[in-house]
Amino acid sequence: ATFKILISPTPVIGPDRPTKKDNHSNKGFFYEGENIRKFISSQPNMYVICGDRHWQYVSKHRKYGIVEFSIGPNSMEHAGGWKQDNVKPEHLYLNVVGGVMTVTIDPKDSPKIIVSHYDVDGNELNKFVATAK
């Protein structure tokens, strides 16, 4: 496959809140997370999609260059858990909102992956596009 996507119930890249200890993006499972990140970084055109975050984001790991997408909640009622102005260096996109996310693979010419975040009304908020290496 040109593109490979790991779908994880929790973040592998993050960032996550400092008090959290239950996923691969923080100190609680650092060893396991580091092994996963090393493997992912050895795979060309591999991305991570995670759930269980109550905000939308796209982040890029500073050491490994891995890009992770967080879908966020389906409703505004469940959006929260992160401050909108708490943008970290690894964030390429951050929005504490509900909505949906789509992933499209365009195989024509130079293959591309297109990941778009939408709000609860279907308005596109962010679009990430990358060409296969």
Where are these regions (language model features)?
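Long, structured stretches of catalytic cores involved in phosphate-ester chemistry, encompassing
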Residues: 1-133
